């Protein structure tokens, strides 16, 4: 076993796994989605988390209908739990449709999604 500690996960009303994190020192509520290839942050929170864009916008496919505009960020500081600290790039994408669905089912809003890219690189 490595020296990293475990991070407490919460189960939402919709049975999604949630965790609290800090991104560039700011608190974030993140949904854990093993089916999401990339970790992402709600584009409206770019300034709040002090995220810097990298590259040009692109069309991203997801669970919603059609494609959505997205842009990558430079790596930023992320902290999960008390001791895990690392760097992570995110996809900035509009998550209003995700939050609307969660809200309609009585669940809390999320700031972003931890995807398979993060999970694979931080086994």
Regions inferred by a protein language model and the residue ranges of each:
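Pepsin/retropepsin-fold aspartyl endopeptidases
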Residues: 1-123
